[in-house]
UniProtKB/Swiss-Prot annotation:
NCBIfam families the UniProt entry points to: infC
Keywords, comma-separated and alphabetical: Cytoplasm, Initiation factor, Protein biosynthesis
Source organism of this protein record: Mycoplasma pneumoniae (strain ATCC 29342 / M129 / Subtype 1) (Mycoplasmoides pneumoniae)
Record flagged with keyword Disulfide bond: no
Name of the gene encoding the protein in the UniProt record: infC
Domain of life: Bacteria
Subunit structure and binding partners: Monomer.
Family of this protein: Belongs to the IF-3 family.
Taxon lineage: Bacteria, Bacillati, Mycoplasmatota, Mycoplasmoidales, Mycoplasmoidaceae
Protein name per UniProt: Translation initiation factor IF-3
Key word Cytoplasm present: yes
Length: 201
């Protein structure tokens, strides 16, 4: 089954979709939780930061509202600690625009790498190995990473030379398209795996 690499962790596709749904729901909650502005701010006094970043000290809400009206700006609650609420004078429209722009940029910078999986036995037939190699090459050309897994049961699990041979034979077939990011290592007594990534051109 294809796997997803998300922030350094391997998760199944079904779990990935659940995570994506949770992210969407979280984003929806974020949109609903807009910052308190102007007369929606419930504190009678708060520390006021002006539009230039200067700390004006503790100011009464009525005075701050007058100041905001005179400057054609908004009061935005940026620190809601009841013992020390902090409010800033700014253009709320511009403020929300900048926040959305930063979020969009952050999403662009995020990368989700999909990982395909190839599972073989040490005794796999040559034509089957060639088919899986061709499949892997196609995935690599599309940018996928490939997890190569060798399952060895019974006495074959102790034949390390056979396990290494099947990997080496496979790698010779796919080497033009991929390189080894994680070498073949034992995941359990009966399973060995390696991680292959598209070769940089």
């Amino acid at each position: 089954m294809p796997l997803i690499l998300d922030q350094g962790c391997f998760v199944s596709e079904s779990r990935f979709h659940r995570l994506a749904q949770n992210i969407k729901q979280g984003s929806r909650r974020e949109r609903e939780q807009k910052p308190l502005i102007n007369d929606k701010i419930g504190f009678n006094e708060f520390i006021l930061i002006d539009e230039n970043g200067s700390n004006l000290g503790t100011v009464r809400r009525t005075d701050a509202l007058k100041m905001a009206e005179e400057k054609q700006l908004d009061l935005v609650l940026i620190g809601s600690n009841p013992a020390k609420p902090i409010v800033k004078l700014l253009d709320f429209g511009r403020y929300t625009y900048d926040l959305k722009r930063k979020k969009r940029q952050s999403k662009k910078n995020q990368t989700i790498i999909q990982i395909k999986e190839v599972v073989v036995k040490p005794t796999i037939a040559k034509h089957d190995l060639e088919f899986k190699a061709k499949q892997t090459t196609g995935w690599a050309e599309k940018g996928y990473h490939v997890k190569f897994v060798v399952r060895a049961f019974g006495r074959v699990s102790t034949r390390i030379e056979l396990i290494e041979k099947v990997f080496n034979d496979f790698y010779l077939l796919v080497e033009p398209a991929v390189e080894v990011q994680k070498p073949l290592t034992a995941s359990s007594k009966t399973m060995y795996s390696a991680l292959l990534v598209p070769r940089k051109k």
